[in-house]
């Protein structure tokens, strides 16, 4: 398994992976497979090109088995869309994806990573804690599903 950045021209592969994630864990995301399946090919091409958000994928052979994105927000990089195929879990893909986003963010001068996790994703919360994330104490509405909330976790990228 290796982790690499999604590049321009891989919009269709990114779409297929994202839809798998949304179907596998609809409670973990603020969107739905039905909604995103209707997005135009140009949306996926833009996401793959990484103009605003960078996406990393975990690849096993030729199969994409996981993803995580990073979106800059000042000194913070938001980790978005984190997902690993159930068959590839507990093999290091999740940690490798988080580390790839962290390395990219640190190279951009970011001070920390932030992400949100719902109470319906205890395995994800455990992964984030093991990867050095800690609670901020903040809760925010889950994007796309405002009645639900996600807890905000962060990971420092600076050495003290």
Question: Which ranges hold each PLM region?
Answer:
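Loop/helix-junction capping segments adjacent to catalytic residues or to phosphate/diphosphate-binding pockets
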Residues: 12, 91, 122
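Extreme N-terminal starter segment of soluble prokaryotic enzymes
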Residues: 1-3
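Acetyl-CoA-dependent GNAT
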Residues: 5-87, 98-100, 104, 108, ...
């Amino acid at each position: 398994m290796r982790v690499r950045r999604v590049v321009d021209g891989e919009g269709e592969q990114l779409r297929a992976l994202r839809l798998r994630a949304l179907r596998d864990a609809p409670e973990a995301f603020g969107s739905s497979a039905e909604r995103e399946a209707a997005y135009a090919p140009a949306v996926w091409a833009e996401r793959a090109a990484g103009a605003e958000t960078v996406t990393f994928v975990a690849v096993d052979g030729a199969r994409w088995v996981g993803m995580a994105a990073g979106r800059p927000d000042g000194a913070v990089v938001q980790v978005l869309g984190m997902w690993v195929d159930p068959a590839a879990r507990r093999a290091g893909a999740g940690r490798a994806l988080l580390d790839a986003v962290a390395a990219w963010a640190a190279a951009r001068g970011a001070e920390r990573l932030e992400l949100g996790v719902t109470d319906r994703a205890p395995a994800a919360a455990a992964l984030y804690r093991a990867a050095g994330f800690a609670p901020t104490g903040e809760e925010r509405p889950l994007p796309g599903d405002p009645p639900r909330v996600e807890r905000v976790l962060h990971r420092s990228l600076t050495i003290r």
